[in-house]
Amino acid sequence: MHENTNTAETDVSTSTDTVGATGAEVVRFDTKVVVVLRDNLLPWQELNVTAFLMSGIATSQSGLVGESYRDADGNDYLPMLRQPVLVMTAGVEALAKARTKALGRGIPMAVYTEELFSTGHDAANREAVAAVAAEDLNLVGIALRGPKNVVDRVVKGARMHG
């Protein structure tokens, strides 16, 4: 089994412009988070895959998740990812090509395969992925986070989800 020894050290820091058009602070991120879904999924599958893939991104590095939320009445809510997430779609071949490019560039990525729709727990999910060679994975989605220009090249050919 091939093990990817490339690593992409990505900075969780941001650069900021002090004032945007609305008078509010504008935050610009050095990295980009993208989910690419296969373009023939059912709506429930799109949501399910996106949720699972984003759990991989959110837990992949400390500092990606912001502070907890609190409303004016003092109710606390869980923290969320600090930066926006783009959701895109692509055909089977473009999705496989994006996976290969991400691996080649050392971009950490989460994968979701067709087989995971029929598994019932985390261990079974890992077993289903482990049973298939990388080039033969029946991908329905990937999620990645890395430097903007690298991620843009990796997902070239995908289009915004609409």
For every predicted segment, state its role.
Residues 2-162:
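Positively charged, small/polar-rich N-terminal and surface patches that mediate targeting and assembly
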